[in-house]
């Protein structure tokens, strides 16, 4: 199974013309993130056959030079967003990795699908592209991963992500969940949750190579 087949199946099942028309207008008349060519970067960097872990985000960062198509990741020269800083703090506490760069392309290449449930956003307006159709598309992506893969780790931070559990066959996949790494909630159970070592322990238990969460040149 490849993304091209899954995309074909989804777009055959659902009509995304209204969303397509909306996005054409938005990209023509407003500043929208990420750049058009990066909307699907999560799928470009993580082929379907390589998926070991799915980390669900919400919508892209809405500031300049941030979003580039991977959930939680920002472009190499951007400032660290607070949630990502907390993710790295937990990573250091969990398995001793100290990451210096704010982009997560190496995770994506390791097999971590960094999937936002909404893939575009208008500059400075969080959730501005909610309910235009992306949720339908990404729900189908989650279901496809659940249906066609085995032994994938789904990392679900915060209530919106955890609402997606209903799309996942928990009998053949691993669910790791906690509060969101946002500064508003991280101290209520994200810190100390050890998602990275738990994910690797599960992967190794089913005969898969663990994720290299530490800094990579990739």
Curated annotation (Swiss-Prot):
The keyword Ribosomal protein does not apply. The active site is at 59 (proton acceptor). Belongs to the uracil-DNA glycosylase (UDG) superfamily. UNG family. This is Uracil-DNA glycosylase. Signal peptide: none annotated. It comes from the Bacteria. It is found in: Cytoplasm. SUPFAM superfamilies: Uracil-DNA glycosylase-like. Its EC number is 3.2.2.27. Its main location: cytoplasm. InterPro entries: UDG_fam1, Ura-DNA_Glyclase_AS, Uracil-DNA_glycosylase-like, Uracil-DNA_glycosylase-like_sf. CDD domains: UDG-F1-like. GO terms for cellular component: cytoplasm.
């Amino acid at each position: 199974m490849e993304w091209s087949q899954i995309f074909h199946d989804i777009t055959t099942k659902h009509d995304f013309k209204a969303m397509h028309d909306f996005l054409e207008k938005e990209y023509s008349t407003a500043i929208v993130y990420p750049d058009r060519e990066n909307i699907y970067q999560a799928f470009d960097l993580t082929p379907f056959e390589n998926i070991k872990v799915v980390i669900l985000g919400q919508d892209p960062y809405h500031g300049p030079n941030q979003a580039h198509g991977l959930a939680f990741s920002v472009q190499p020269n951007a400032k660290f967003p607070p949630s990502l800083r907390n993710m790295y703090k937990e990573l250091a506490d969990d398995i001793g990795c100290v990451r210096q760069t704010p982009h997560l392309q190496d995770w994506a290449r390791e097999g971590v699908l960094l999937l936002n449930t909404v893939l575009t956003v208008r500059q400075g307006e969080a959730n501005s592209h909610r309910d235009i159709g992306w949720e339908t598309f990404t729900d189908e992506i989650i279901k496809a991963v659940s249906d066609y893969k085995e032994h994938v780790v789904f990392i679900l931070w915060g209530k919106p992500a955890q609402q997606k559990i209903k799309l996942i066959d928990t009998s053949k996949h691993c669910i790791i969940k906690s509060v969101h790494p946002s500064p508003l909630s991280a101290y209520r159970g994200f810190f100390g949750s050890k998602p990275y070592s738990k994910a690797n322990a599960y992967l190794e238990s089913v005969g898969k190579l663990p994720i290299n969460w530490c800094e990579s040149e990739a």
